[in-house]
Amino acid sequence: MQGDIRRKKDLLPRYKTGSKYNSRRRGGYLTTPMKKIIVYIILLCGVYFVIKVAYSDLNKETEIKLESHSSDVSASASDHTNIAAGGAADATNNKQPQQAKVPKEKFNNEVAKQQEVKNLENDLKPQIDSEKQKQINKDKKEQKQQLQKEKQDLAKENLANNEILDN
């Protein structure tokens, strides 16, 4: 049923090896062992960079910067005296009302969240006396008036120069 045995001109080149008989074997540099070596080198490089990044953060010194304003410094100094006095000055100097802490599970109301954000923003802003605020506003108005006067003077000078050039 199989017919004659053909060895020299076999239809399937079973025992013939080399790139001229098999189109898949062209380019002999990327053999399986070479691919394994390349993957191993890439893996080692990846592990090296991961360790390098992980330990580079540990070598740096941690820097903690707090935003401080002049009013915050005075408020923090009064807080330290309150702590040293055992809270006796708390009853007399109640500048900052203490807010009750609410657990996160019960803090579901969106309006309450927004109000809390506003309160936190107000606490972080430096509290300026109304007199200081008025003085700042006056200074700003004076600066604007001076700038307007300077612009008008420059415009008059330009007109005078143009008239002189025209004559």
UniProtKB/Swiss-Prot annotation:
Transmembrane segments: none annotated. It comes from the Eukaryota. Residues 1-26, 67-167 are annotated as: Disordered. Residues 71-80 have a biased composition (Low complexity). Residues 1-13, 102-156 have a biased composition (Basic and acidic residues). GO terms for cellular component: Golgi apparatus. Present with 2190 molecules/cell in log phase SD medium. This is Uncharacterized protein YKL063C. The lineage of its organism: Eukaryota, Fungi, Dikarya, Ascomycota, Saccharomycotina.
